[in-house]
UniProtKB/Swiss-Prot annotation:
GO molecular function, one term: calcium ion binding
GO cellular component assignments: cytoplasm
Presence of the UniProt keyword Calcium in the record: yes
Pfam families reported in the protein's UniProt record: EF-hand_7
Name of the molecule in the record: Parvalbumin beta
Lineage: Eukaryota, Metazoa, Chordata, Craniata, Vertebrata
Amino acid sequence: AMTDILSAKDIEAALTSCQAADSFNYKSFFSKVGLKGKSTDQVKKIFGILDQDKSGFIEEDELQLFLQNFSSTARALTAAETKAFMAAGDTDGDGKIGVDEFQALVKA
C-alpha cells in the first residue's frame, strides 16, 4: 500500500493542494507527498501500484486516475493535466511511462 512507503499525513496534504481542477503539478505533488526523497526501490514499488494492469507501463487511462491511487475519494486528473503529465514523463514518445521514465520524473 502507498502508506507502507508514504505517510498518510503527507498524502493528505499533497491531495489537498491539488483539489481544484487543473491545479495538479507533478513536481510539487511528488515533493509534498514525500516521494522525492525515497529510494529507487521505494519509487519502483509506487510505480507498481500506479501500473494497475501490471503491463510494466503507466498508460494514459491509469495516469488520469493517478490521484485515486493515493486516496479513493480523490478526483481524476483533467484531460489537460493528464496530457501535460504524460508529456513530462514520456521521454521516448511511446505514449506511456515506463519505470525508468517514472524514476526520472520523480527526481526531476
